[in-house]
Structures are given as structure tokens and as C-alpha cells.
Amino acid sequence: MSRRRRVSRRPVVSDGGPGGVLLARFINVVMSRGKKALAERIVSGALKMAESKSTGETGVSIFNTAVSNVMPRMEVRSRRVGGVTYQIPVEVREDRSTSLALRWIVKAARTNRKRTNKTYMSCLCNELLEAYNKRGSACKMKEEKFRMAEANKAFSHFRF
């Protein structure tokens, strides 16, 4: 363990747009090699495409609902007890849950882009719409985490 003081978390600066801090965090996750302006263009284009494909919903509300649908509630943590490693189900903190959801959406869009011949913007739009409808790769990742936690419920008495 480090003897230094605890590291304070730096707040994410919002651009003052309608999406707020969550959208700013999403742009930071989408960003690659420090190209933030490109990431902002990709995200805003994907939200506009999602808004045009859906009926009556704004892009930001689609994004917020998609993220809340992908956020995991439970996950497993490894703990060594008496020479045996157990997978212990624990509840996920709010900030970790949000960041996992954002990462899963971006990861699903990137893998989909490699499989298909579409642009990253359209793949991101499709993944957001699928997460909005509780389908898609990102939702499968959430369900996989929950299934692992359910399978190891017997070890929940080894809480951290």
C-alpha cells in the first residue's frame, strides 16, 4: 500500500451543452489519441442520427436512457480465502457503474465497426439505439456480469 495521501478525483468539465457531465464523460471515452474535437463530432453526429431514427425523442434523452439501461448493478470480485479464490458478488458503485456502461457502449460500437463496413458514427448510433431498446452487445455484457453474480450468490457471505 502506498503511504501517500489519497488521490482526489478530478471533476469532468462539461461544455455547458444539453448533455451535461455524462455526455462530456462519454466524449472522453470515445476520444482516441487526444483528438477531442473529432470525438465531439462523432458523438454529436451519432446523437443526431439516433434522434432522426427514433420518433419524438431527443438525442440526449436517448443517450441517457441507453446508459441507464446498460449500467450494471452487480459484479463479481475475486477474493482469496484459505488458498481458494472465490468470485464474490458485490454491488457496483454508481460512478463505476456509469463508467462501465460508457466503456461497454464504445467497445460494442468499435467491434461492430470492425465487422461491418459502416462508419464509426453510424455504429455508435446503432449501439445507442439498441441499448435504448435493451438489446445489443452492451446489454449482453451487463447481463453476463449479472449472471456471474447470480451464479456465485452462495459466496456472498465472504463480503469485502
UniProtKB/Swiss-Prot annotation:
Function: One of the primary rRNA binding proteins, it binds directly to 16S rRNA where it nucleates assembly of the head domain of the 30S subunit. Is located at the subunit interface close to the decoding center, probably blocks exit of the E-site tRNA.
Cross-referenced InterPro entries: Ribosomal_uS7, Ribosomal_uS7_bac/org-type, Ribosomal_uS7_dom, Ribosomal_uS7_dom_sf
Pfam families to which the protein is assigned, alphabetical: Ribosomal_S7
Entry superkingdom: Bacteria
Entry annotated with the keyword Ribonucleoprotein: yes
GO BP: translation
Subunit and partners: Part of the 30S ribosomal subunit. Contacts proteins S9 and S11.
Keywords assigned: Ribonucleoprotein, Ribosomal protein, RNA-binding, rRNA-binding, tRNA-binding
HAMAP family: Ribosomal_uS7_B
Lineage: Bacteria, Pseudomonadati, Pseudomonadota, Alphaproteobacteria, Rickettsiales
A GO term from the CC aspect: small ribosomal subunit
Molecular function as annotated in GO: rRNA binding; structural constituent of ribosome; tRNA binding
Family: Belongs to the universal ribosomal protein uS7 family.
Keyword Ion transport set for record: no
SUPFAM superfamilies found in the cross-reference section: Ribosomal protein S7
UniProt name for this protein: Small ribosomal subunit protein uS7
